[in-house]
Amino acid sequence: MEIRNAIVDAMFCIIYKKKALTWKTGIERRTECNLPTSNMAAQRRNLMQSHQSWTDDLPLCQLCGVGTAPNCMYGTDGKDTQSHPNEDTHLRFRSEDGCSLYGVFNGYDGSRVASFASQCLTAELLLEQLSADHSDTDVRRILTQAFEAVEKSYLHTIDDALAEKANLSGYMLPHSEKVQERLKELEQEVSGGATAIVALILNNKLYVANVGTNRALLCKTTTDGQNQFFQLGRPHNTDNDDELKRLAALGLDSARVRQAGQIAGQSSTRRLGDYRVKINYNDIDLLSAGKTRPIIAEPEIHGSQSLDSVTGFLLLMSEGLIDALECAHGPEHVNKEIVAMVAAELAQQTTLEAAAQSVVDRVKRLHHDVYTSGRQRATFCSRHEDMTLLVRTLNYPLADGVLTPTQAGGRIYPVSVPYSNSQSTSKTSVTLSLVMPSQSTLTNGTNTASTLEEGTPTPGGWSRCRRRRNFWTRQPCI
């Protein structure tokens, strides 16, 4: 337990020593790094504010590509302006022992928590904590403990700032200009949170850990020749019945929570950081009746799922990407559209990075085109948040001129993808030549493409779209 509590300290030692090959006890680590115990929290805070990361020296997975786009809001002329610094981050590492770790972190009120979580979680999972002889139960336990350590470590980094904030709030001259300025600085230092979707591949088995409202999709070609896609888990939000039951068991009024749609400005019922709903949850009306902390950082873990003989790809998506496509086309077919776009780009691009980025760029264009179309849905597309898409291929070839999906025995399939034309008044479709790596059809779960995601339900349908974005539009999505 002492070693687990000091894991983050080791991570910061790695920063200053550049390379750390073995774990030592907490005292040894502090001695080696010449960092006194009392100074550890300050060092953590300094690192969180810098661009330096010990993970910069880790090997990236070459079977993975990432596409990103910053948040933006559109002006009346259709031009976009970034409204705040990027808050998303991601990780994609592959250790020498064959363990691969991927993640997409969606930050809010700053990128501090997302950046901290991505670094700390990597230290918790890729420095020899996992081995090939671990059982599924062991891996799930280690994943859960890793998120717990990240949460505790982050909250520890803001202890001093929270104490100073509490002290100044009770100051005899609280309205002093200097006091108010310092309180504002402290609030900026401690505020913020993040949601996370993390995938781990060990022994060619897939494990997915989710905290919040990001999404994971697995697309694979089955033995009967069908390409199926599955949503791995459901979002932890105010439309998730299981989450509402969990909150009700803690004493909360689940009906009020569902009706509110958001808790402290976010729809997620699980999140990392965000001291307001963790340390000060009793001060929030919706949460004040809770017997314990209602908003938690415990991940929901899916797996293991064997990847032996699997051909396809894994997608990790930030909430911003999902929201942008939902606002443009509605939530019913988002998974199908994303899978079709990724498959089409993999058949055309020569690098995974280019394929992932092309999909994100396309979603951004679709969102923008709906806004400039002047149609009814334009009202709900006036802005979008940061977007991140991580694509990890599973024996899936690229169009690299050497081995393309068609050369590998695949066929070309027409796939209808909704497309918004600024000159029209309704959503139309265009047909893509979708190249799949085998003779198959695109399906969802065990259903064909015509079933339109019956196997991956979207909780709450349009109501979820409305509640998640009511702080933008104050109107229902239709």
Where would I find each of the regions flagged by the language model?
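PP2C/PPM-type serine/threonine phosphatase catalytic domain
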Residues: 1-478
